[in-house]
Structure formats: structure tokens, C-alpha cells
């Protein structure tokens, strides 16, 4: 067998530093399933995002399923774990434009937005979507079209992947 010890990396919001002028970050509120977190990390790493911010975490990011599902993304992308309030203060302080994945009367199609600036994309919980903390702000809500007649939602990591890659496509 193989035994190793590693130093745990910092997961503090204040330790996030961006090398690009217009960073792209993904914010995930209260994720519960380690596999979804890992899949989001994998996609965020593949898309070359600048960070993943997890608010009000409901499981451990060090869960084996999270690390396994990330396929190494866990070790390659900066991760911050904080409260909703801390995340919101950070995004405002650093002047991010914020897009929330949300279906309501103000929601616009995700592909009609401009993600080329300093951008944060915010996803809600697997079961309930975004809390009032994110809904009650003046952020731009975006939605994915779902013309199918049976399914009205997508898996968290699938929705996140679509939104991340639209932002990446626009930045080329």
C-alpha cells in the first residue's frame, strides 16, 4: 500500500488572488452531494476558471467522492468555503458582475448575457435552487431554456457546466 500525507490547502475567501484582470468564478450555494461538487470542480478546471466559491457547505470538500469525481480538479483550482454573506461582500468589494441561475420573471436567457468582464456565476442547491439571500439582490438572473415537456430542471453540475462554457466561449 501507499501512504502519504499532504498539507491541506487554504480554503479561505481572503486567500483568493486572481492573476487575470477579469476573473471568472463559480459560486455554489449549499451543495450537499460530494459527487456534484467534484464534477463542478472537474468542469471548472477544464474550463480554466479562476476559482470555485462554496457557500454554506453541507458536506466536506475533502470527501473521497468529491475528490474522486474532480479527477484532479480539486488540486488544481482555488476553492474558497465561506458563508453567503462573506461571498456577497467579497463579490461586491471586488466589483464582480453577478449572474444567478434562477427561474423567475426577470430571468433572461443565459446565452444573451455578456460574461467577458469580471464575472461570478451563482448556482443554488440541488433541491431548492437559490435562497432569498441571492434572490433579493439586484443580480442578473439567467436561465437555461428547457423546451422539453417532461423535465423542468437539470443536474447541478450539468447546469454549471453549460453556464461556465458559455462564459468561456465568449472570452475567446
Regions found by a protein language model. Give the residues of each.
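Conserved sugar-transfer catalytic core signal across GT-A, GT-B, and GT-C glycosyltransferases
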Residues: 40, 130, 163
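Residues immediately flanking
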Residues: 8, 30, 125
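Active-site/ligand-binding-proximal alpha/beta "capping" segment
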Residues: 99-151
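Generic beta-sheet signal
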Residues: 2, 24-26, 118-124
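Short, structured interface segments
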Residues: 1-11
Amino acid at each position: 500500500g501507499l501512504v502519504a500525507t499532504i498539507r491541506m490547502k487554504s480554503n479561505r475567501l481572503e486567500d483568493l488572488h486572481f492573476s487575470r484582470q477579469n476573473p471568472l468564478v463559480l459560486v455554489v450555494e449549499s451543495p450537499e452531494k460530494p459527487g456534484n461538487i467534484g464534477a463542478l470542480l472537474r468542469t471548472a478546471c477544464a474550463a480554466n476558471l479562476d476559482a470555485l466559491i462554496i457557500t454554506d457547505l453541507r458536506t466536506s470538500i475533502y470527501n473521497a467522492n468529491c475528490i474522486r469525481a474532480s479527477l484532479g480538479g480539486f488540486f488544481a483550482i482555488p476553492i474558497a468555503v465561506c458563508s453567503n454573506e462573506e461571498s456577497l461582500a467579497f463579490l461586491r468589494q471586488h466589483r464582480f458582475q453577478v449572474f444567478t441561475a434562477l427561474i423567475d420573471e426577470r430571468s433572461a436567457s443565459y446565452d444573451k448575457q455578456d460574461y467577458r468582464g469580471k464575472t461570478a456565476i451563482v448556482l443554488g442547491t440541488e433541491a431548492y435552487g437559490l435562497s432569498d439571500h441571492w434572490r433579493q439582490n439586484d443580480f442578473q438572473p439567467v436561465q437555461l431554456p428547457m423546451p422539453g415537456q417532461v423535465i423542468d430542471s437539470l443536474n447541478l453540475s450539468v447546469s454549471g457546466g453549460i453556464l461556465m462554457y458559455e462564459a468561456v466561449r465568449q472570452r475567446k
